[in-house]
């Protein structure tokens, strides 16, 4: 009623990261406000065929209500830090006014054990995020038992936050303790409180006033005398600070006025508050689903809820009349503060997206010059940064890898964001591409911090809703340290309907040579396929990359599709041809015919490839024809994931519409008239290409890089993982033998010709 600014405020509303398990309380408040109906409350956790309410905050399920998913636990605090930082970034770049806006994160003390909860505290202080407020509900319990039964979680968190440079406000004891504190001139209360462990405090609230008198006050004569005139009921009602509205108000008021550093409020509470014998302060509270009639009556009486005994068994919802003083006041306060919360804006700004022609410097090919797709991406980014319509919206995000990816030229051009600018003279200041930090810098240089960098990407990718300002984030990183490292955050990004680009650099298990097992990515596209609204591509050529990026901009920022893009780019240099005519649709759909051999011998095969391995496929086609007089068609497959999605959609349509003429998947339509077996080779696990097997009308064999990576040259790695041109030829020959059109002696001949050892180590298990 007093602090949280709504979306109609002067500079926009506050951003609330609400503890997932408190969702029912938020729904109850929204019911009183008239935002939710009784029918909706009755359908809590029943969402499939009714207008129900999601279990936890999920924007995908309630897209105009919840802003941020905060489960699994730990995601909320990390996101909140980078959201507050992104508001400062936008403000310092002159894109928004954020004066007075706050980012609130409501957390649990048990949740603070998550590394994500505390791992970025120093960043918040270093960036001077005085627009950030954490409220930690310290009820001393987690699901199974005490958070720190043998210790004190509040003091532990206080030390942690103070050490990180935060402003700490503790709300420990409620107002009913104040008279006792006033009489305690010698500090006996403080002494006893410091002696008690959190396990003791849990026991006090799980029992009654007599127990508290005996085990807390009677330990010292001075304390025993202090409460000798208090009844057990009065002792029992000595409240904790987190349940005292006046104490909480005072803490919030102090927090919003604080300047210079982020603030944390540590509020001591009781888990199961109000449940009494049904679960207050007990270890079973989290699993308590029902209350007995007597327990319901006790709850009603404790909080003065006007429900009669004859109605109590129905557990009715209670809401004062709309013209009651309480509801009028509640609505008046929200109106004064700028509207209701939580609220997610679905009014989306539309950007003017450049046409593909503006990328002609990339799509026309590079002649004899050899570059990587990473460098092609940097060129595309440069084109976008020169576009007057969207250049200011571009947010390059890098976790200490700009030089790795050849992006250091952007340091001077657009600068690295720093809230204090550059207070030192960089060692390379006399060079053209020196390390330039600036208050209005555009690059978010995150250091070695993939989780934080991804949270910056989320903040930018959801700015169209949070700030009504569409931003276009490009986060480029080692592909192995993406979904595998921060998969939970990527899933949350999908839930939030994030829009932006993820660039998995140095991708491909055999393409990143020399760095070994933990760096070589052979499965990021497999992980990307698990997120329903993640659109992923593995392009080979610069023109494919340009088409994909331009289409992504169109889909996300003009068409307003709730998707985000994952694109793998490589560090292998090779030549990039001109874009063939009419391939744009195939690039976007996931495959197109790159080269057709119209001679077509008796034995003919279809060869598929993607990324850098497509070049091995092209080489294999030449070897097949030169060494065995076998012709082939070559397909560039930009996305097995997109082909699978389209195939499943067609399959479902046919299942659901048996009376209609069956549709054909795009894969089927492209291959149905093409003779010969299909061999698909990628730099990823075979399951990546296996996804389209149901839609391939021909015999289908896949090659991939299953197994652990290792350091060596690309040539050695590709032979080890059996994805080089020699193994593609061998596989094609075996497929023709299986078709009955080729004698197996040709396979034996090929193994001798290419020096393939039949007893070589199996890369899947070695």
Label each residue range with its predicted role:
Residues 12-16, 66-69, 96-114, 132-134, ...:
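A short, small-residue-rich loop immediately preceding and capping a beta-strand
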Residues 324-484, 489-499, 560-561, 582-603, ...:
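Non-catalytic terminal/interface segments that mediate subunit docking, oligomerization
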Residues 2, 29-32, 83-89, 120-123, ...:
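Generic, well-ordered alpha-helical scaffold segments in large soluble proteins
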Residues 1-127, 150-151, 407-410, 417, ...:
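Cofactor-binding active-site loop characterized by glycine-rich and histidine/acidic residues
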Residues 46-69, 75, 79, 89-100, ...:
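Thiamine diphosphate
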Residues 14-15, 26, 107-110, 142, ...:
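Conserved short loop/turn motifs at secondary-structure junctions
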Residues 2-5, 14, 20-23, 28-71, ...:
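Conserved internal helical-beta-strand scaffold that buttresses enzyme catalytic cores
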Residues 105-108, 112, 488-509, 514:
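A structural-propensity feature for long, helix-poor, extended segments
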């Amino acid at each position: 009623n007093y602090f949280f600014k709504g979306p109609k405020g002067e500079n926009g509303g506050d951003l609330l990261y609400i503890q997932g398990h408190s969702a029912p309380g938020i729904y109850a408040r929204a019911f009183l406000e008239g935002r939710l109906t009784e029918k909706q409350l009755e359908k809590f956790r029943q969402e499939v065929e009714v207008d129900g309410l999601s279990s936890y905050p999920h924007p995908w399920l309630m897209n105009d209500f919840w802003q941020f998913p905060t489960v699994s636990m730990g995601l909320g605090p990390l996101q909140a830090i980078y959201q507050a930082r992104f508001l400062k970034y936008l403000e310092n770049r002159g894109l928004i006014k954020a004066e007075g806006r706050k980012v609130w994160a409501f957390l649990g003390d048990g949740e603070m054990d998550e590394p994500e909860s505390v791992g970025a505290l120093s960043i918040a202080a270093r960036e001077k995020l005085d627009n950030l407020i954490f409220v930690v509900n310290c009820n001393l319990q987690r699901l199974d038992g005490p958070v720190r039964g043998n210790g004190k979680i509040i003091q532990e968190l206080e030390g942690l936050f103070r050490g990180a440079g935060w402003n700490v406000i503790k709300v420990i004891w409620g107002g009913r303790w104040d008279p006792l504190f006033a009489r305690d001139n010698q500090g006996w209360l403080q002494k006893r409180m410091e002696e008690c462990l959190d396990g003791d405090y849990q026991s006090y609230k799980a029992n009654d006033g007599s127990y508290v008198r005996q085990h807390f006050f009677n330990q010292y004569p001075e304390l025993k005398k202090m409460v000798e005139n208090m009844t057990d009921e009065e002792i029992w009602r000595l409240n904790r600070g987190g349940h005292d509205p006046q104490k909480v108000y005072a803490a919030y008021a102090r927090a919003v006025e604080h300047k210079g550093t982020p603030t944390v409020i540590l509020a001591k509470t009781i888990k199961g508050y109000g449940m009494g014998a049904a679960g207050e302060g007990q270890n079973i509270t989290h699993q308590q689903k029902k209350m007995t009639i007597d327990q319901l009556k006790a709850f009603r009486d404790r909080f003065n809820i006007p429900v009669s005994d004859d109605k109590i068994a129905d557990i009715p919802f209670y809401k004062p009349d709309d013209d009651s003083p309480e509801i009028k006041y509640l609505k008046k306060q929200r109106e004064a503060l700028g509207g209701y919360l939580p609220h997610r804006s679905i009014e989306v700004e539309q950007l003017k997206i450049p046409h593909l022609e503006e990328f002609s410097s990339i799509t026309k090919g590079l002649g004899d010059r050899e570059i990587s797709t990473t460098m092609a991406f940097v060129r595309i980014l440069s084109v976008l940064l020169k576009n007057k319509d969207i250049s200011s919206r571009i947010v390059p995000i890098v976790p200490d890898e700009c030089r790795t990816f050849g992006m250091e030229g952007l340091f001077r051009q657009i600068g690295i964001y720093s809230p204090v600018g550059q207070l030192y003279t960089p060692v390379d200041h006399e060079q053209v591409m020196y390390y330039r930090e600036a208050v209005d810098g555009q690059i978010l240089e995150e250091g070695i911090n993939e989780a934080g960098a991804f949270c910056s990407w989320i903040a930018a990718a959801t700015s169209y809703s949070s700030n009504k300002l569409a931003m276009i984030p490009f986060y480029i990183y080692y592909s192995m340290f993406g979904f595998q490292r921060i998969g939970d955050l990527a899933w949350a990004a999908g839930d939030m309907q994030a829009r932006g680009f993820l660039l998995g650099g140095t991708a491909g298990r055999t393409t990143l040579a020399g760095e070994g097992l933990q760096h070589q990515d052979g499965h990021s596209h497999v992980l990307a396929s698990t997120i329903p609204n993640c659109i992923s591509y593995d392009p080979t050529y610069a023109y494919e990359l340009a088409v994909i990026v331009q289409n992504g901009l169109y889909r996300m920022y003009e068409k307003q599709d709730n998707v985000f893009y994952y694109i793998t780019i490589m560090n292998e240099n090779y030549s990039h041809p001109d874009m063939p005519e009419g391939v744009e649709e195939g690039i976007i759909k996931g495959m197109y015919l790159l080269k057709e051999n119209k001679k077509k011998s008796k034995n003919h095969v279809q060869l598929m490839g993607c990324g850098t391995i497509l070049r091995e496929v092209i080489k294999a086609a030449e070897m097949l024809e030169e060494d065995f007089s076998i012709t082939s068609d070559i397909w560039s497959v930009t996305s097995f994931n997109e082909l699978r999605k389209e195939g499943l959609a067609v399959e479902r349509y046919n299942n659901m519409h048996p009376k209609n003429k069956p549709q054909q998947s795009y894969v089927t339509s492209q291959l149905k008239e093409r003779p010969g077996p299909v061999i698909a080779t990628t730099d990823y696990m075979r399951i990546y290409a296996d996804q389209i097997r149901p839609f391939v009308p021909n015999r289908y064999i896949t090659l991939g890089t299953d197994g652990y990576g290792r350091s060596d040259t690309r040539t050695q790695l590709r032979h080890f993982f059996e994805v080089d041109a020699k193994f593609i030829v061998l596989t094609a020959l075996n497929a023709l033998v299986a078709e009955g059109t080729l004698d197996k002696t040709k396979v034996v001949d090929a193994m001798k010709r290419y020096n393939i050892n039949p007893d070589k180590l199996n890369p899947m298990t070695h």
